Design a protein with these regions (language model features):
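Catalytic-core helical/loop segments in enzymes performing group transfer/polymerization on anionic/lipid-linked
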Residues: 1-8, 13, 18, 23-830
Length: 830
């Protein structure tokens, strides 16, 4: 058992502190990196910071070395020892104080590091993979007794608040990001996505002392007021000029200001001692002790009272009235009620700032973009806030969907490593049920399968087999059939065929059915049917993705030769009347006829058998297309697995005479570039053709058909007409919606050596590094089950390259032989 989404312009840091120094720039790590404004050599005292933050060096884009008391001597006697440019410490804790002392002795700067405002899914104790940090060379944002880099950034933005185009764009961007953060319910920690209804809690009488004693009318319309409790000893409380007396004042003020309201105290979810929870509370005050989503909770209240919690700023983003009883980084700018804040500190802060007002967008942009730094755990590279949000949304969704016990049911042994890489999530406990071979039958765990817990199977055939088995087994026990998740290859799979045992970088997991089975609904069909109008950000992302797909020539398997204007493939040429052969692309163009590409498929594949088509063989497809288009120029493209001799679907010479050309070894993007229409039963090539705005004629019902984007042949015949009824939307589906649901929402992506699930754009960048020749390192990493430390392609030896090629060739030959024996056995059984 295995337990278990453009670069931002950063405001340049110019220190005003006596102890801080101007920080040199370092080169960004790549196209997705943000400009680095801190030194590239840092030192830390102790091991806690690096151990608790696995991606600290990645987000800071710096080399972090541990500093020992004798490290200064190393610099004297070891010429290879590089002196750090700055020391780093955590907040104002001991690590920072020790780092500051060491930095003063070395006469270099000290930087304070803290968790960012969008930190991770789980709490800091449970997750070492934080997505964001803040770096401060002046102070730290929660200590208002002195200035901080965040305060300086806000002041600078306010002073530059003239109507420049750049600031207008920044304001719009801040509004878009705030809207998305609130819509996705993102906070510092994001393990919980929902919050119980406060009205329902009152109706149920939970934590309701008044109802128990007086039986009052719980359904009376009253407002909700939230008081945010904090952990005793929290450094931000002292930094806000507050103590336990401020919490008492806050409670008293809230009760006096809202005598008829429902007052709630948000306690710390980890059951740590708080200031409010240990007080004697009035009868109309209730405590929320359960883990819940902060944004979902704040959305239900009218007023929020806080001392120094960041939830106060999140309440401002939601348009709530915020009453501060401490001096926060977001208070004193005219956005909050600061009448209860410590007067002396508030006066000092306002005098220091010399700015009386700042907009919400200015505060957000300064804090979340200028001040914060982000890293994507999937790529382990510095990134923008958009990428961090995409990672949080994707990984939280799948961690929630697959939480609990899950049985991986009878997978091939070679698939298990990459299956674990996709679904071995923090809140998922996997049980591996092997195939029923003799050695597995002898294993004690083989018969310990709990058939009442969710199962994960590979492909439609295994799903049907398990459903049939469980219907008989559980009917005797009067138990419902458990959830059966169906896993399959994704739409952007790998640089090679799945039949050669090459691990995928993308899979789909479907709870209802599977995308290629038109006989019943699937999760993808449901996504497409319920797809709402895309936001401006989503449309921008989809358009950029479409451009990337076309520019990088992306296809599912990414196999075949690219056609060059100076060369041709002998296997994809036509005999001409002259002495020189010509390529089929050139011949088709010169013919002046309508060019139709017929896409071959694996005939015994379930995507053909369950697509509702009357035509289910490649030969019949060629015959039908020729019959309906007698004057067209036909090009037939065999399926890669059939072409490699691994699967059934070979077309005889009799039917091949009906076509003018056969694209044996031409890459699919080149095939699509040379035709006018695509004719297919249910191939994914039809979707790739829609990307290129080509006319697509479907003889079956693939996932992209039936929405008004394709020509659906035999739509009036059963059973296809029956299946089409499920796809009748009130509003037409746009191609942007189709692309977003199919490539962004539906699949799961991963990268070798990465943590968590990746995004489609990242997988494309990995598979297409910018040159035609793929490095052997990538092919090897993709095929590996367990993550290994990546090395540069240039460092690979010739022996390693040849070894990888021989391994793939041997695997292909083995699969070809196996397919031949399977065909012989089928003929014998007949």
């Amino acid at each position: 058992m295995v337990k278990s989404v453009a670069n931002e312009d950063k405001t340049t840091i110019t220190s005003t502190s006596k102890t801080a120094t101007s920080l040199p720039s370092a080169q960004p790590l790549g196209a997705t990196s943000v400009p680095n404004l801190i030194p590239n050599r840092l030192a830390v005292i102790g091991k806690g910071m690096r151990n608790n933050n696995a991606l600290l060096a990645n987000v800071l884009q710096a080399d972090i070395q541990r500093w020992y008391p004798w490290s200064k001597l190393q610099h004297r006697f070891n010429s290879n020892f590089k002196k750090p440019h700055a020391f780093i410490g955590w907040g104002h804790k001991k690590s920072y104080q020790r780092a500051k002392k060491a930095a003063n002795r070395q006469n270099i700067a000290t930087l304070s590091i803290e968790d960012g405002f969008l930190r991770s899914i789980d709490s800091g104790i449970s997750s070492r993979y934080g997505l964001s940090v803040v770096v401060d060379d002046i102070g730290i944002y929660f200590d208002l007794w002195r200035s901080s880099r965040l305060e300086e950034l806000i002041i600078k933005r306010v002073e530059q608040s003239s109507s420049t185009d750049r600031l207008i764009l920044d304001k719009q961007r801040a509004q878009q990001l705030m809207a998305r953060i609130c819509t996705e319910r993102l906070s510092k920690y994001n393990a919980v996505i929902d919050c119980p209804s406060l009205d329902d809690l009152i109706d149920a009488g939970k934590n309701d002392k008044i109802a128990a004693a007086k039986q009052i009318d719980r359904k009376s319309p009253k407002s909700h007021v939230l008081l945010i409790d904090q952990v005793v000893g929290d450094a931000s409380i002292k930094g806000a000029g507050a103590d336990k007396r401020q919490f008492k004042r806050m409670l008293k003020a809230a009760c006096q200001a809202h005598p008829d309201a429902h007052i709630w105290i948000k306690a710390h979810p980890a059951a740590k001692a708080g200031y409010l929870t240990r007080l004697t509370l009035p009868e109309n005050v209730r405590i929320l002790t359960q883990a819940l989503n902060p944004i979902a909770l704040l959305a239900q209240v009218n007023d929020v009272y806080t001392v120094s919690s960041h939830m106060g700023f999140e309440a401002l983003m939601l348009g709530k009235a915020v009453h501060c009883f401490g001096v926060n980084w977001y208070s004193g700018w005219g956005l909050s009620d600061d009448s209860g804040a410590p007067k002396r500190l508030l006066k000092t802060v306002k005098k220091r700032r010399q700015v009386s007002a700042a907009s919400l967008e200015t505060l957000f942009y300064s804090a979340y973009i200028d001040y914060s730094r982000y890293v994507d755990p999937a790529t382990k590279q510095a990134c923008t806030i958009d990428s961090a949000i995409n990672w949080l949304v994707t990984n939280r969704y799948w961690q929630t969907c697959l939480a609990g016990d899950l049985t991986v049911y009878e997978f091939s042994r070679w698939k298990l490593p990459f299956v674990k890489a996709f679904i071995d999530l923090p809140r998922t406990t996997l049980f591996i049920k092997p195939k029923p071979r003799l050695k597995n039958l002898l294993h004690l765990d083989h018969f310990r399968v709990n058939y009442q817990q969710p199962l994960l199977v590979w492909g439609l055939a295994k799903r049907q087999q398990v459903q049939k088995k469980l219907s008989g087994k559980l009917s005797k026990q009067s138990s419902a059939i458990p959830t059966i998740f169906c896993m399959e290859d994704g739409f952007i799979r790998s640089n090679g065929l799945g039949a050669t045992l090459l691990a995928p970088l993308s899979v789909v997991i479907d709870q209802q059915g599977i995308y290629y089975n038109a006989t019943q609904p699937s999760d993808l069909e449901t996504l497409l049917y319920n797809c709402k109008t895309l936001s401006a950000q989503q449309i921008t992302r989809v358009q950029a993705l479409q451009t990337k797909l076309l520019t990088q020539r992306v296809s599912k398997y990414n196999v075949g030769n690219r056609i060059s204007s100076n060369s041709y493939d002998n296997s994809d040429t036509l005999k001409s009347t002259g002495n020189q052969p010509i390529s089929w692309v050139e011949a088709a163009k010169k013919s002046g006829k309508l060019r139709l590409l017929i896409v071959g498929q694996v005939e015994d594949d379930l995507s053909v058998q369950y697509c509702g088509a009357h035509i289910q063989t490649n030969s019949s497809l060629i015959e039908r297309v020729r019959q309906d288009n007698p004057d067209a120029y036909l090009i037939y493209k065999p399926h890669p697995d059939v072409e490699a001799g691994l699967r059934a679907g070979k077309v005889t010479e009799r039917y091949l005479k009906s076509v003018q050309a056969i694209a044996y070894n031409t890459a699919m993007p080149d095939c699509l570039a040379g035709v006018d229409e695509v004719h297919t039963i249910s191939s994914l090539t039809g979707f790739e053709a829609l990307l290129r705005d080509l006319k697509v004629v479907c003889y079956g019902l693939p996932f992209y058909a039936g929405w008004g984007l394709t020509v659906d042949i035999d739509a009036q015949l059963l059973p296809k007409s029956k299946y089409l009824q499920r796809r009748k939307r009130k509003t037409p589906l746009t191609f942007e919606q189709l692309l977003h649901a199919t490539l962004i929402d539906y699949p799961l992506y991963r990268l070798p050596n990465g943590y968590g699930l990746a995004q489609v754009e990242q997988v494309i960048d990995y598979l297409y590094p910018g040159h035609d020749e793929r490095s052997a390192e990538q092919a090897d990493d993709t095929a590996k089950a367990m993550p290994a430390k990546a090395s540069k392609p240039s460092a690979l030896s010739t022996v390693s390259v040849l070894s990888a090629q021989l391994k793939r060739r041997a695997t292909t030959q083995f699969m070809q032989k196996r397919h031949q024996w399977q065909q012989r056995l089928r003929k014998t059984s007949r």
